[in-house]
Every structure is written in structure tokens, then in C-alpha cells.
């Protein structure tokens, strides 16, 4: 369809395969289709656009929002019921608790005149969350066409491969369709398609080319690149607006935007500030080369003990384990730094990067640097989990490892010094590299 080619860019092959699988409205389609690919590879957009453009009866459900079996099944049934009763405008809420009830109610809903002779499509986005629900749910959806004896196709959209889904007991195999990552040429074409009407397509394409030249090595997420393109474009065309350069003066435009793109690279994915705050920061910033206001330690707020946990984690990451006695025991005797040095330790630990440490060592350092007695309560452990969620600590290894969890501290020296100052702790005195 020519209309689809203009709306769905760089996914012609996938659209063609899906159209051939869907077939005619009254034909029985493939019972289940598994679509997978990395984030922002167009899975959801292509599927929704295709179903809407072809005006096929479908329901779209996000498995993150419907996090229980009952929520998921009721959402599907009520959306289908709304489709079937759209003509008379009245519909009642359906309740459903088991998959057996779902099959029975699904048969009733799809007997409506406008759903009877055509394929109904159920789209389950973020389908990887189905694995955390009841064991019979995934095999049931894969065989829904057979169980309900209805013309229905279930589409699973996921970021992980089918092999991670397949139950050990076996199941009906879906048709698997892969959405590859967009190439740099694809991204150039898609992003250039968004050009503002007040500027020429060539001018915006040149800007996108510069943007991808800076960000493509660190970010290939279409959503993030599109956000960055919108955010930084006013700064790129600023010399043109002021009359200081023409649209073809790419060298001058590049010199103007370069420091701001470098600054934006520090916050890819982070969303530390809103778009409006970013624009205000660009207007107020007299020194574009300085990374002002974007560092997390300028506005991060942590509970009192979380700060000490983070400090203890930093010390555990950057101090050799055998130096703990020197720093944290009162009667350790006089030990010179030269006694610790080995040939491979001539390089600073800060240059080598953070090293993993066990939970026991973290707690031992925490108890020695906090003045008051801290009991190892659930509150302390929940604060450690919160620091992992905030990505100030990272969990190293697998959750099911037998020797207990290991962590790494991911913050910089400037960050931890700023945190330490808020609790009057001189962290430099406790760092092996600064002896």
C-alpha cells in the first residue's frame, strides 16, 4: 500500500511479511506470531499502524500495565466487547479470573455480527512479562485459535528471543518475525522525515547528519535520538535566525552546535532535567563548554544512612581489601604504604576503575565509619536496593549466586566528595590512592 510506505519507513520487508500472514479478512490467519527486536526497532508502531490502516478488528494490551492474570484477561475481553457492541453503543464490564473462563467468554464475545466472519487480532506488547504469570497462560494464548475454535491471531511483541519463552513442557510454535536494529542510513531517513515545515528538508537532513555523527556510537535508540534532535535543533538554527549564517553555512552552524551536543552526550538516556529546563539552561549558559547543572550530585537527595552506604561502597570499590584493617581498625599498628605496594599496583585504583566487593565487606566498612551503632535491619538492605535502582551501585553477577551478592560503586570521585561533605565525612583520608 502506497500510504503505508509513507508512514512506515525502512520496514518494508516486515510490513510485507505481516500483510501476507494476515491475508484476507475472512481467511484464517496464523494462530500466533512472535515479533521480537531491540527497543525502538519499530515493533509496536508497525503493528499498530498496519492494523489501523487495514481497519482490522484488534485489541492492544500492554503486559506491563496488566500485571496480573485477571487484569490481562479482563482487559482483552472488555476491549473486544467494546468492538462488538460499538454499533448499539452499550456494553457491560466483563469479569474473568481463569484462562478457562477466558476461552468461554471469548467465544461469546466473538459471536457478534461484526466479528463473526473476520480475523480478530490480539496484540500483547511487552510479552516477556507473561513468563512471570501462570504457567498455562503462554501455551493457552499460542493455541487460542484451536481452543476457542474462532478466527483469531495472537501477536506477541517482545525485546527478547523466542528461545527464552519456550516452556520446558513444549508448546505450539508461533511464527517468529525479527525486527533488526535500524542502520545509520535508516535513522538518517526516519529522523530527516520529521523536518519542521519552516526549514528546508536539506537543511534539516544536514543537522541530522551532524547529530548522528556525534551520537550514533553511543546511542542507536530511535526514540532517544528523536528526543535529542528536537531538543538541540533550536540551538543549531540559532545563527540562521539571528542572520549570522545561511542554511548552507554548515561550518559555522557546526561550530555553534558542537559544544552543546557534547554537553547533551553527558545526559543521554538520563533525563536528569526536563526539556524546558534544558532550553533555559542553554539560554542562560554563558560558557557552553562547561557542563553546568547537569551533574547528578548537584541535585541528588539521599537519606542520611544511604549517603554512608554509598561512601562505604566507594571505599570498598577503590581500596584494596587488605587495607581495610589499616583504615578501619583503631589498633592496627603502624603500617607503611610501601609494605602494601606490589608491581601490578603502580597504577592508581581510580584509573583502573571500581572493583566488585561482597555485601559483608560493605556492611563492615559502614559500621566502622558511622558514629552511632547501626543494626543490620531490613531498612539498611532496602536502602542498598534503592541505590542499585538509582544506578549509583550495580549488582555484579547473578541473583542466584551462592556466595552472596557483589556490588560495584559507579559514582565519580567528585560525586562522592560532594555526598561526603553533606555528612561532614573526609573521604580523602580513607582512600588508599591519596595516602
From Swiss-Prot:
Tell me which tissues or organs this protein is expressed in.
Answer: Abundant in spleen, ovary, prostate, testis, and colon mucosa.
Q: Does the keyword Transferase apply?
A: no
Residue positions binding ATP: 37-44
Pfam families in UniProt: AAA_16, ORC5_C, ORC5_lid
Compartment list: Nucleus; Chromosome
UniProt superkingdom: Eukaryota
**UniProt keywords, alphabetically:** ATP-binding, Chromosome, DNA replication, Nucleotide-binding, Nucleus, Ubl conjugation
Q: How is it modified after translation?
A: Multi-mono-ubiquitinated by OBI1; ubiquitination is important for efficient DNA replication origin site activation. Ubiquitination levels are low in mitotic and early G1-phAse cells and are induced in late G1-/early S-phase, peaking in S-phase and decrease toward the end of the cell cycle.
Q: Which GO terms describe its biological process?
A: DNA replication; DNA replication initiation; regulation of DNA replication
Q: What GO cellular component entries does it have?
A: chromatin; chromosome, telomeric region; cytosol; nuclear origin of replication recognition complex; nucleoplasm; nucleus; origin recognition complex
Listed GO molecular functions?
A: ATP binding; DNA replication origin binding; nucleotide binding
Q: How does it assemble?
A: Component of ORC, a complex composed of at least 6 subunits: ORC1, ORC2, ORC3, ORC4, ORC5 and ORC6. ORC is regulated in a cell-cycle dependent manner. It is sequentially assembled at the exit from anaphase of mitosis and disassembled as cells enter S phase.
This chain's function reads: Component of the origin recognition complex (ORC) that binds origins of replication. DNA-binding is ATP-dependent. The specific DNA sequences that define origins of replication have not been identified yet. ORC is required to assemble the pre-replication complex necessary to initiate DNA replication.
Q: Family per UniProt?
A: Belongs to the ORC5 family.
Name of this chain's protein: Origin recognition complex subunit 5
Organism, as annotated: Homo sapiens
- Gene giving rise to this polypeptide: ORC5
